[in-house]
Regions:
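Alpha-helical transmembrane segments used as membrane anchors
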Residues: 1-189
């Protein structure tokens, strides 16, 4: 049996590693150059313009080809998970919750890729978005598939990022009310 100290230290180490790895992948994605020799792009040129080097060129090419612009969502999910592990103690954390978060992150990624594929051109959703959206559109039509994807996107984002929509709306409402009263008192004075 692993003690709580060792387990927490291991989780913190993995979280910091995930943040550093996500930062490297972010640099590789931002400096992506389609002319770099990479995983899906074989060229005779040996010149690599990606700031992540040959590994960054391969990783960014793979992510952009498969997931499109949703590659940045993968990084966001990883960073949010790492920050929540480091800074917030979840009293309801369990193996089933971790599995649900993984599955909901995957559903969120698929839905986001498909919506990007519909709204933006040039393969913005990657191969995954194209395949899923074309098959859903054939089965449900364009509007039906968009409704289906949004219905999955909303709860998947809540489960993946570990937040409550009700608490978020409540906080937003209290901010609006306090802003309204401050504006009213300012205008009346």
């Amino acid at each position: 049996m692993i003690s709580n100290y060792v387990r927490n230290t291991l989780f913190n180490f993995l979280s910091f590693f995930l943040i550093a790895f996500s930062l490297y992948i972010f640099i590789a994605l931002v400096s992506y150059d389609s002319s770099d020799p990479a995983f899906f792009n074989k060229t005779s040129s040996l010149n690599i313009n990606n700031l992540g080097g040959p590994l960054g060129a391969n990783v960014s090419d793979f992510l952009f080809t498969i997931f499109g612009q949703a590659s940045f969502l993968i990084l966001l999910i990883g960073i949010v998970w790492a920050l929540q592990t480091i800074f917030f103690k979840d009293q309801y954390n369990s193996r089933i919750k971790i599995i649900i978060r993984f599955v909901s992150s995957f559903i969120l990624l698929i839905s986001f890729c498909s919506i990007l594929e519909y709204y933006f051109a040039n393969n913005s959703g990657g191969y995954l978005g194209k395949i899923v959206f074309i098959n859903l559109s054939n089965a449900l039509g364009f509007i039906g598939s968009l409704v289906f994807l949004v219905i999955f996107l909303i709860p998947a984002s809540s489960l993946s990022f570990n937040f409550s929509w009700l608490k978020t709306v409540e906080i937003f409402g209290s901010i609006l009310i306090s802003f309204f009263f401050k504006t009213k008192s300012f205008l009346l004075s």
